[in-house]
């Protein structure tokens, strides 16, 4: 067992034992990692990978096209990247404003099925974090749910760190 497997297996085992079958999954954040590292983790059974940058992800996707992987965009999404995000990702976890929704819906190829989206909510009103205000989340959810090529799957939020807890 190599070092990667030694770190990965206990994590996956703990996840499986803590949740009913299929109730929780692991998205391995592969941003800044080379395609070879993604391939190595895929060989251990990991299928979902998270990327921050559309262009970096597209290069990896081309290099790893022979693998059946699920790609998540976890970084901020600019409107000029919606076309590539809608066409090449399975999930966009960082929808933080209404302007992105019709762009993603329009650019999603019908043959790929609906694009899974998470609405990013800035729950602590941190200036350094992206996300819509909590009070705007329901209106954003209603807009997302009305679009046929998007599948609203939930929320994504990163709470403010509390080192004393």
Predicted regions and their residues:
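Conserved alpha/beta-domain cores
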Residues: 1-165
